[in-house]
């Protein structure tokens, strides 16, 4: 799948624009602050209904504009296309449209337009809180396991009920036991989905990483959120008093984590920033491979400021891997010469110059 048209209005400093990107490689170049990252942000908004630069959408709306809107036409792998639209106004009203119909949730967008983001904050996947790694893990499971979303919703409902009971004691013993059974059932299913996903991801990640950088002894493992030798029901029963003191459930899938270690050490503690970025790139490219194996279609990659923290050899290796995925890629850089050359002659490459919010296509992939 790929975006064949993108229209952006009212997003940060960008002038209203409609782009016809290449189905493969798209390079956006221009000075810092010109609006390159805002283009990626608009596409991210279209696919996830969230910004990767701000936890709130209000700052995304252009100054003195009533709203921001992004439309896109997605060419589907199975043929045909789908029209997506996302709009948010200053009063907080949010609208998601898919083929002319209001969508129920952002998950419907994500299913049609799977996005992967690689940017200067990518190292947070290694250094940041476990929540970031759970989001990475569950993105992958969501796109390859059709039962995941319904089970995840069951888990969240049961967990919410149990945490409410822990804080307020509003359930009788029979109701509490019923919700605990539901929580354990959903937790076991989520754990099964995640475990199967990591088993499939590990060899692809290891192969991808070996093509980017040599890091002997780097291992990827999965912690499910409770003792692997015990049933969750046993753990919950033994920790009930501590959970009541804390006011929330301390064991379960909501405490899961991915662990990357180099020998006996946490990888984030000893890898350079550039090495961390390469590890994250390998993880995200491996995810793209798995999506393409399970679904008819590819992820779309948003790569912001690719040259930063990578030398020429590693930059070329990363571009080669992205090219081999045969997916659509949007890459930003200051100088187009960093990225213009080196692609295969049969790979369609489009160039867009961004200056003070104005976007001009300087090379059409169809030429």
Swiss-Prot record:
<dbReference type="GO" id="GO:0000731">
    <property type="term" value="P:DNA synthesis involved in DNA repair"/>
</dbReference>
<protein>
    <recommendedName>
        <fullName>DNA replication and repair protein RecF</fullName>
    </recommendedName>
</protein>
<keyword id="KW-0227">DNA damage</keyword>
<comment type="similarity">
    <text>Belongs to the RecF family.</text>
</comment>
<dbReference type="GO" id="GO:0005737">
    <property type="term" value="C:cytoplasm"/>
</dbReference>
<dbReference type="InterPro" id="IPR042174">
    <property type="entry name" value="RecF_2"/>
</dbReference>
<dbReference type="GO" id="GO:0005524">
    <property type="term" value="F:ATP binding"/>
</dbReference>
<keyword id="KW-0235">DNA replication</keyword>
<dbReference type="GO" id="GO:0003697">
    <property type="term" value="F:single-stranded DNA binding"/>
</dbReference>
<keyword id="KW-0234">DNA repair</keyword>
<dbReference type="InterPro" id="IPR027417">
    <property type="entry name" value="P-loop_NTPase"/>
</dbReference>
<keyword id="KW-0238">DNA-binding</keyword>
<dbReference type="InterPro" id="IPR018078">
    <property type="entry name" value="DNA-binding_RecF_CS"/>
</dbReference>
<keyword id="KW-0963">Cytoplasm</keyword>
<dbReference type="InterPro" id="IPR001238">
    <property type="entry name" value="DNA-binding_RecF"/>
</dbReference>
<dbReference type="GO" id="GO:0006260">
    <property type="term" value="P:DNA replication"/>
</dbReference>
<keyword id="KW-0742">SOS response</keyword>
<comment type="function">
    <text>The RecF protein is involved in DNA metabolism; it is required for DNA replication and normal SOS inducibility. RecF binds preferentially to single-stranded, linear DNA. It also seems to bind ATP.</text>
</comment>
<keyword id="KW-0067">ATP-binding</keyword>
<dbReference type="InterPro" id="IPR003395">
    <property type="entry name" value="RecF/RecN/SMC_N"/>
</dbReference>
<dbReference type="Pfam" id="PF02463">
    <property type="entry name" value="SMC_N"/>
</dbReference>
<keyword id="KW-0547">Nucleotide-binding</keyword>
<feature type="binding site">
    <location>
        <begin position="30"/>
        <end position="37"/>
    </location>
    <ligand>
        <name>ATP</name>
    </ligand>
</feature>
<dbReference type="GO" id="GO:0009432">
    <property type="term" value="P:SOS response"/>
</dbReference>
<dbReference type="GO" id="GO:0006302">
    <property type="term" value="P:double-strand break repair"/>
</dbReference>
């Amino acid at each position: 799948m790929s975006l064949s048209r993108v229209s952006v209005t009212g997003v940060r400093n960008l002038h209203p624009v409609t782009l016809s990107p290449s189905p493969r490689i798209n390079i956006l170049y221009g000075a810092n602050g010109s609006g390159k990252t805002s283009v990626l942000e608009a596409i991210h908004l279209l696919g996830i209904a969230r910004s990767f630069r701000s936890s709130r959408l209000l700052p995304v709306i252009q100054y003195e504009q009533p709203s921001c809107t992004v439309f896109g036409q997605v060419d589907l792998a199975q043929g045909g296309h789908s029209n997506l639209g996302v709009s948010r106004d200053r009063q907080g009203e949010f609208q998601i449209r898919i083929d002319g119909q209001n969508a129920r949730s952002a998950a419907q967008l994500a299913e049609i337009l799977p996005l992967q983001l690689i940017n200067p904050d990518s190292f947070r996947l290694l250094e940041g809180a476990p929540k970031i790694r759970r989001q990475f893990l569950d993105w992958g499971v969501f796109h390859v396991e059709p039962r995941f979303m319904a089970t995840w919703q069951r888990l969240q409902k049961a967990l919410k009920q149990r945490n409410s009971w822990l804080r307020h004691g509003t359930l009788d013993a029979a109701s509490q036991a019923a919700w605990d059974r539901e929580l354990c059932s959903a937790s076991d299913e989520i754990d099964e989905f995640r475990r199967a996903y990591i088993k499939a991801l590990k060899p692809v990640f290891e192969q991808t990483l070996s093509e980017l950088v040599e890091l002997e002894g780097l291992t990827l493992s999965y912690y499910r959120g409770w003792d692997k030798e015990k049933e969750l029901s046993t753990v919950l029963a033994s920790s009930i008093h501590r959970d009541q003191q804390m006011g929330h459930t301390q064991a379960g899938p909501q405490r899961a984590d991915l662990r990357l270690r180099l020998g006996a050490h946490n990888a984030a503690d000893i890898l350079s920033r550039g090495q961390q970025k390469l590890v994250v790139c390998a993880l995200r490219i491996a995810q793209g491979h798995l999506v393409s194996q399970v679904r008819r279609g590819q992820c779309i990659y948003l790569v912001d400021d690719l040259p930063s923290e990578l030398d020429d050899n590693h930059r070329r290796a990363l571009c080669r891997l992205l090219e081999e995925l045969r997916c659509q890629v949007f890459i930003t850089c200051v100088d187009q010469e960093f990225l213009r050359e080196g692609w295969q002659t049969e790979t369609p490459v489009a160039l867009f110059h961004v200056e003070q919010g104005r976007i001009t296509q300087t090379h059409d992939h169809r030429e």
